[in-house]
Amino acid sequence: MINLAVVFLIIAVIAALLGVTGVAGMAAEMAWILFVIGIVLAIVFWVLGRRPPPM
């Protein structure tokens, strides 16, 4: 998930350098969304992984 966020961030930077601001904004927003989802999932799995298995 974080890998996709990095890819979209790179696309956003390249698009911004080329002057395509619409694509840059959209790619940056997608990178931010994927980054937040990745962090939230990492925290959820970290918390759930610490519980003992149900009996």
UniProtKB/Swiss-Prot annotation:
Signal peptide: none annotated. It is found in: Cell membrane. GO terms for cellular component: plasma membrane. The chain crosses the membrane at residues 4-24, 28-48. Keywords: Cell membrane, Membrane, Transmembrane, Transmembrane helix. It comes from the Bacteria. Its main location: membrane. InterPro entries: DUF1328 (IPR009760). It is a multi-pass membrane protein. Coiled coil: none annotated. It holds the Pfam family DUF1328. The keyword Transmembrane helix applies. The keyword Acetylation does not apply. NCBIfam families: PRK13682.1-4 (NF010229). Belongs to the UPF0391 family. This is UPF0391 membrane protein Neut_2351/Neut_2360. The lineage of its organism: Bacteria, Pseudomonadati, Pseudomonadota, Betaproteobacteria, Nitrosomonadales.
